[in-house]
Regions:
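Domain-level signal for soluble alpha/beta catalytic cores
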Residues: 1-377
């Protein structure tokens, strides 16, 4: 049990994936949207920023590298828009967070969904080429159930009518999404990807018992959507290659240092922790909003848990002793050798990013690294 080189994720000192966008990337994207910069010009700026980011990840001693999600506006929607049969539309409102609303975008089904020629495959190839010795390039994508949830909402006029013109039932839609994901995953694997991460806010919603109650969802309804989440996510990764590690990160919202949902993992643990066929769970535990560690007793034997005990929502550094103590508390439910440490989420799930500086961001990473070396000597 140590922090020495490991062949694949999770790593003792890990990350979720997104990083604060440099101003040059924000400016280039704004110029592109305004028609003042073409696609090749935008890509050149992104390429330079990603090279610099990967160099900083290496310098920080991370074994995993990502592109920081610098080529995206959102952690989830850009992937959905890259699927065949799904298009970008303006929604009536943005997503509602505590004290803040996001920009208004959504995803609409306009034809049969498939995963051929997804742009994220080319994005991954760029990062893969930057891997150093002992490093693993990670591709983050929204979980299949996240895509299902987005396209079945009613966030813009005609969204439901367009969906049902293509898929009459939820079962047909789920099958199509699972198949599309299998295609993208196979293409990523062929491009050399050995670590994929499903980012999943649907479970974070189901943790929020007050929000669930306000929607009128009954316990039976919650059971049905939880069953669907497990079934769809598992269908998307069925028959994956043995050397492809697929993990999942559960989030309660991470926009401009705000959150959307709260509540412990108790309602979802018997489904997510016990039955989802991923290798590891990256879980938020940075505030009391995430509840205690008791639901970890449902984690299937041999599965790994990455404890998100260091927040990305605030610059202040956590007390190292307190984090060490919490790791050992979690070890009452999952063996210490199956526990890992990371920030609770990314630093910029959307372009706007959280309210901290780049230096403060890297100080958080350094803190994770120090604590991991202390716990897993």
């Amino acid at each position: 049990m140590s922090t020495s080189i490991q062949p694949n994720a999770p790593f003792r000192a890990d990350i979720v994936g997104s990083f604060l966008r440099p101003q040059a990337v924000k400016d280039a994207r704004a110029a592109y949207v305004a028609g003042k910069l073409d696609a090749s010009g935008l890509k050149a700026v992104e390429d330079d920023a990603i090279r610099d980011l990967v160099a900083k990840q290496k310098a920080a001693g991370l074994q995993v590298i990502t592109d920081g999600e610098f080529r995206r506006s959102y952690w989830h929607l850009d992937f959905m828009w890259g699927l065949n049969g799904i298009e970008r539309r303006t929604s009536r409102t943005g997503y509602m967070f505590h004290d803040e609303e996001t920009t208004a975008d959504t995803a609409v089904v306009t034809g049969p969904i498939s995963g051929e020629n997804h742009p994220f495959v080319e994005h991954f190839k760029f990062v893969k080429a930057l891997e150093g010795e002992g490093q693993v390039a990670r591709q983050t994508i929204p979980a299949p159930i996240q895509t299902f949830s987005e396209v079945t909402l009613d966030r813009c006029d005609g969204q439901q009518e367009s969906l049902r013109a293509v898929y009459k039932t939820d079962e047909e839609l789920a099958d199509a999404i699972a198949a599309a994901y299998r295609t993208v995953i196979a293409d990523l694997y062929a491009a050399g990807c050995r670590n994929i991460q499903f980012d999943d806010c649907t479970w974070g919603i189901y943790c929020d018992t007050d929000f669930v109650a306000k929607t009128g969802m009954s316990p039976v309804d919650l059971q049905k959507v939880s069953e669907l989440g497990v079934t769809l996510n598992n269908a998307a990764i069925a028959d994956k290659p043995d050397d492809l590690v697929i993990n999942t990160h559960v989030c309660r919202g991470n926009y401009h240092s705000t959150y959307a949902f709260e509540g412990g993992y108790d309602p979802i643990a018997p489904y997510l922790f016990a039955r989802e066929d991923v290798d590891a769970f990256y879980l938020e535990f940075d505030t009391p909003r995430a509840g205690g560690f008791e639901p970890l007793k449902y984690v299937a034997p041999g599965k790994k848990v990455v404890l998100g005990l260091v927040t990305t929502k605030a610059a202040e550094l956590e007390d190292e002793d307190a984090i060490v103590e919490r790791i050992h508390e979690a070890a009452k439910y999952v063996p210490l050798e199956n526990l890992y440490l990371s920030p609770q989420c990314g630093f910029a799930s959307c372009e706007i990013g959280n309210k901290l500086t780049e230096d403060e961001q890297w100080a958080k990473i350094a803190l994770v690294k120090r604590i991991a070396e202390r716990v897993w000597k």
